[in-house]
Amino acid sequence: EKYVYLKTGVRHNTVAGYKTVINILKKEAFGRQRIDKVRLSDAKAWLIKLQQVDGRGYSSIHSIRGVLRPAFQMAVDDDLIRKNPFGFELASVVVNDSVTREAISRKQERDLLKFIKEDKHFSRYYDGIYILFYTGLRISEFCGLTIQDIEFEEMRIKVDHQLQRTSQMEYVIQQPKTESGIRYVPMTEEVASCFRRIIANRAHPKAEPMVDGYAGFLFLDKNDMPMVALHWEKYLEHIVQKYNKIYRIQMPKVTPHVCRHTFCSNMAKSGMNPKTLQYIMGHSDISVTLNVYTHVQFDDAQAELLRVAKA
C-alpha cells in the first residue's frame, strides 16, 4: 500500500490494477506475511498456487507480479530486506497459457467486412469496423475521435487523446501513454468516405456530451454518451457469432485489438518500412513493431524470396 501511495501521476487503469492486487493479497494468507519473512521459494509457491489451484491465467499472474516486484524492490532500496523475492523470471515458474491474439488473414478480413456490409442489422457498424481494420488505431483512440480530429483536406487523422470509461462508469480522456502515441495517421480515400458517412449519419443529441473539455464524439450510444471499447468488442463478438452460425468455415475471435494487429500485419507483409509502421501504430518501442514481422507464414516467405530473386 505504501508503494501504491507513492506512485503518483499514474493512469486510472494502472490505479485500478493496483487496487485489484491489494484486494487479492488481503484475501490470501500469503498477503498477511511480514515482508522480511517472504522467501524466494514462498513467492514462487504462491504464484504457482494462483495458477494451479485458483485457476488464474498467466497474464493475470504477470500483472500481479508486475506490482509486487517493484513494491519489494522499494523495500530492498529502503534497506528493509536484503533481496527481492520476486526478482525471478516468471516463465520459469508459471506456465504461459495465454492465447496470442493473432491477426486474421486478408481473405477472412474481406469475408467479414462483406458480411457486415450486407447484414441488415450489423451494416450500421460497417464504417467504424472498416476504419479499425484500415487505420490500426487503438480502440480507445478511435472512441476518443471527435469531428475536429478528422482532417479531410490533409487526409489524416489527428490522434492526441484516448477515451476510456472507468469501472465506476465515469468517462475520462487520457493522453497517450508515450509521446509516440501523439501522431497523425494517414487515411485512404475509402477510410475518408467512411468518416464522411459517419459524420453525415451522426445523431444530433439535445445536449452534446462533453468529457474533460472534448465534445463532438463520432459515435454516441442510446444514452447519447460516447461509445467506448466495450461497445465495439460486443458488436464484433455478436457479428462473429452470427457469421459462424451461417458459414461452415468458422471465423476466429475478432476484437478491436485483432483489427489493429491485422492492419499492422498487412502493412508489414506489404513491405512497409518498419520505422514508418512504428510511427503509424504509435509504438514507442520499435521491437513491438518488429515482432509483427515475425508473424509471417511460409507463403509470405516464399513470395518474398521469389520477389527478391526476380529483382
Question: What are these language model-derived features?
Answer:
Residues H62-G66, D77, I81-L145, E153, ...:
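Basic, Lys/Arg- and aromatic-enriched nucleic-acid-binding interface segment
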Residues K2-L80, S98, K120-S123, M225-H231, ...:
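N-terminal core-binding DNA-recognition domain of tyrosine site-specific recombinases/integrases
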Residues T20-I24, A45, G66, P70, ...:
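Generic recognition of well-ordered alpha-helical segments
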Residues D149-R156, M272-V292:
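Short, polar N-cap/turn motifs at the start of nucleic acid-interacting alpha helices
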Residues Q168-I173, S270, N291, H295-A311:
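DNA/chromatin major-groove-contacting recognition/catalytic segments
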Residues L90-A91, L145-A203, M210:
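Conserved tyrosine-mediated DNA breakage-rejoining catalytic core shared by Y-recombinases
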